[in-house]
């Protein structure tokens, strides 16, 4: 029952969700996300969605998931045609109307060792984008440690298999009777 209520958009904004202590955002974030998703889909009526469109779609959905921030990871292979745009996706996102892009941790995956010039370029991009993104992931090393790796949890602390589940959780000890 408590889990269904936490995911229910029908709770009034500001209502405390039983069993969790979270505060409901109401249906406002869902309404806003659906309008933006419709605009995004309509803008691509005559063409395929880009990877950046999919990033926006994923992050817009992420804004509706719960009454507190949800985390996603977005991964892009280094050298991809959209990698530069991806690397800068969060730049000024809180002032340019794309605040939903703040939902994901964006990382570039390297399957071969990058050159010093590539790393310098990546660090310059990180600095230009605000200082923290994109992250970069050494997929060769990850596959040595976990040959089945297909992705990672949002902060890239865990290697995950395809459709794998992150097992990190948070316990609020004050909610347990002593």
Mark where each language-model region is.
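Flexible, glycine/charged-enriched surface loops at secondary-structure junctions
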Residues: 2-5, 44-56, 65-76
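Conserved helix-loop functional segments at active or binding sites
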Residues: 43, 67, 173-177
């Amino acid at each position: 029952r408590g889990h269904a209520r936490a995911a229910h958009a029908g709770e009034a904004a500001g209502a405390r969700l039983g069993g969790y202590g979270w505060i409901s955002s109401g249906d406002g974030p869902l309404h806003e996300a659906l309008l933006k998703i419709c605009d995004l889909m309509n803008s691509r009526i005559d063409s395929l969605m880009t990877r950046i469109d999919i990033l926006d779609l994923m992050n817009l959905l992420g804004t509706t998931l719960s009454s507190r921030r949800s985390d996603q990871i977005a991964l892009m292979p280094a050298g991809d045609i959209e990698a530069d745009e991806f690397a800068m996706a969060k730049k000024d996102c809180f002032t340019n109307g794309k605040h939903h892009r703040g939902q994901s941790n964006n990382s570039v995956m390297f399957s071969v060792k990058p050159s010093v010039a590539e790393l310098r370029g990546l660090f310059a991009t990180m600095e230009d984008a605000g200082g923290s993104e994109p992250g970069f992931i050494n997929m060769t090393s990850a596959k040595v440690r976990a040959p089945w790796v297909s992705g990672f949890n949002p902060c890239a602390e865990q290697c995950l298999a395809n459709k794998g589940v992150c097992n990190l959780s948070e316990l609020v000890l004050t909610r347990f009777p002593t």
